[in-house]
């Protein structure tokens, strides 16, 4: 089972395709938060001498839902081998936004995982097909589950 077969399975999953389409519509709507738009580790810099942190490459910025950038962050924690439990720590940072929806952020994370494993923006992940299959299963769970339990 290769990446092509994994992609074909997702394309054949009507519920998955519909859910991703719904997320695309949310992504395309005007939102209230200024987003980075590509908030993954390749856009983060840490200057060790001053212990400062910078986010670079603002050319993708747009107004949208905060859950989008947070979902990208959570996806890259998962792609980096971290547990989804780390998402709870991230969500705590957004608890002051009353409209923030952790479930939506997790769904966006699911799309980003899929995009980085089998999409046009694949990461050079050092993992075998079994690990990539697990990541795709995680993507499906995040996108299709209505109530995520950690």
Please name every model-derived segment.
Residues 39:
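Hydrophobic HxD+1 residue recognition
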Residues 66-97, 110-127:
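Active-site activation/catalytic loop segments of kinase-like enzymes and analogous catalytic loops
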Residues 42-73:
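Catalytic activation segment of kinase domains across protein kinase-like and atypical kinase folds
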Residues 28-31, 60-62, 77:
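Charged, long alpha-helical assembly modules
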Residues 99-109:
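All-alpha amphipathic helical-bundle segments outside canonical DNA-binding/catalytic cores
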Residues 1-36:
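An alpha-helical support segment within catalytic cores of ATP-dependent transferases
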């Amino acid at each position: 089972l290769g990446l092509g077969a994994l992609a074909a399975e997702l394309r054949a999953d009507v519920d998955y395709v519909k859910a991703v389409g719904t997320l695309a519509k949310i992504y395309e709507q005007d939102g209230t938060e200024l987003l980075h738009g590509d908030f993954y580790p390749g856009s983060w810099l840490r200057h060790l001498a001053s212990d400062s942190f910078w986010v670079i490459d603002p050319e993708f910025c747009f107004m949208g839902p905060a859950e989008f950038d947070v979902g990208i962050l959570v996806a890259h924690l998962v792609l980096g081998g971290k547990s989804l439990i780390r998402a709870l720590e991230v969500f705590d940072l957004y608890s002051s936004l009353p409209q923030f929806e952790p479930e939506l952020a997790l769904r966006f994370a699911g799309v980003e995982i899929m995009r980085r494993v089998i999409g046009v923006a694949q990461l050079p992940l050092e993992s075998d097909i079994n690990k990539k299959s697990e990541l795709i299963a995680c993507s499906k769970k995040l996108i299709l589950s209505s109530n995520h339990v950690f």
